[in-house]
From Swiss-Prot:
The gene is Ankrd9. It is found in: Cytoplasmic vesicle; Cytoplasm, Cytosol. The lineage of its organism: Eukaryota, Metazoa, Chordata, Craniata, Vertebrata. A motif (Important role in both nutrient sensing and binding/regulation of IMPDH2) lies at residues 108-109. Disulfide bonds: none annotated. Its main location: cytoplasm. This is Ankyrin repeat domain-containing protein 9. Pathway: Protein modification; protein ubiquitination. It comes from Mus musculus. Residues 1-20 are annotated as: Disordered. ANK repeats lie at residues 70-99, 111-140, 157-186. GO terms for cellular component: Cul5-RING ubiquitin ligase complex; cytoplasmic vesicle; cytosol. Keywords: ANK repeat, Cytoplasm, Cytoplasmic vesicle, Hydrolase, Repeat, Ubl conjugation pathway. SUPFAM superfamilies: Ankyrin repeat.
């Protein structure tokens, strides 16, 4: 929508006061912001979106003044609506600006840019892959800061993007993050690593497993409602666990290990004997796991995930679509 630059008038016909002028600007900002949001949602062409962003779309900054959308804020919209062409353009044209922290109205704290975590939350595999490729050209400190960003403690529990991937069962996102150097050993606000968080969720899933009758009813409901069954979620969590094992040199320690040892038979049934023995610190990883751990570490982030095609991957990794086109 064109921005109305004409001065307003008061009720008695005189010039409007500063309060009325501020309200008028805020109203126009809301209208133009919503128009830009809808334009991205409707997947309009990149050239048109950039024209709107440059000349027509404004939002209110923290002082209540009209401000143009930055590439960072535009990328947030592209992520929400999976506009891959627009996201790729912003990352290619404004790599640092697109991944910079947005203005205060688009975030809840002073943490680095939320784009990686948002891509995981919305399962935007294609855009996440482009983001990770973009940050490979950044200095090491800047790249690590973006990959290992800790979310807001109030809203995101102080977790990293790996925690988000485990929480929401996003194996494709997790594999991309690990392959590009995200740290699996960082703890969230509750003190859990991604691996420990995942074990906690698997434990909760197993504790709330339905009876056979409930499972049959859930199968019928899932077929009619197109929902994800609890069994499918559990399988995705086990796949997440297999992926984390490839990038985790040791098992779990502290309370998590005590939990594994406290109900060994249950965990052995859930994880399998070999995986349980290693995670609980009772035995070294199997030769297969150790070989895969060495193999994946030979792939540089710059060649990930393309170099996976050259490796004899195990069957559990082959169905993963890391292109975002599926």
């Amino acid at each position: 929508m064109p921005w109305d630059t004409r001065p307003g008038r008061s009720a008695n016909g005189g010039p409007e006061g500063p309060g009325a002028a501020r309200l008028r600007v805020q109203k126009q900002c809301r209208k133009s912001s919503f128009a830009f949001y809808l334009a991205v949602r409707d997947q309009l062409p990149v050239w048109l979106l950039e024209d709107i962003r440059a000349s027509e779309a404004f939002h209110c900054d923290e002082r209540g003044r009209a401000a143009a959308y930055s590439p960072s804020e535009a990328l947030l919209y592209a992520l929400v609506h999976d506009h891959q062409a627009y996201a790729h353009y912003l990352l290619a044209t404004f790599p640092r600006c697109a991944l910079a922290p947005p203005s205060a109205g688009f975030r809840c704290c002073t943490a680095p840019g939320p784009h990686v975590a948002l891509a995981v939350r919305y399962n935007r595999v294609g855009i996440l892959r482009r983001i990770l490729r973009t940050v490979q050209d950044f200095p090491v400190e800047e790249r690590v800061r973006l990959l290992d960003r800790r979310g807001c403690s109030r809203v995101e529990g102080g977790g990293t993007s790996l925690h988000v991937a485990c929480e929401l069962a996003r194996p494709e996102c997790l594999f991309l993050l690990l392959g590009h150097g995200a740290s699996p050993g960082l703890r969230d606000g509750s003190g859990f690593t991604p691996l420990e968080l995942l074990l906690r969720q698997l434990n909760q899933d197993a504790s709330s497993a339905p009876t056979k009758a409930e499972a049959a009813s859930a199968t019928v409901n899932a077929a009619t409602a197109n929902t994800t069954s609890s069994e499918e979620v559990c399988q995705r969590r086990l796949l997440l666990l297999d992926l984390l094992v490839l990038y985790t040199p040791g098992g779990v320690v502290g309370p998590a290990r005590c939990e594994l040892l406290g109900d060994q038979l249950r965990w052995q049934r859930l994880l399998g004997e070999d995986k349980f023995q290693w995670l609980a610190g009772l035995a070294p990883p199997s030769l297969f796991v150790r070989a895969m751990q060495v193999l994946v570490t030979t792939i540089s982030p710059g060649r990930f995930p393309e170099a996976l095609d050259e490796l004899p991957l195990p069957s559990f990794l082959q169905p993963l679509d890391l292109t975002g086109k599926g």
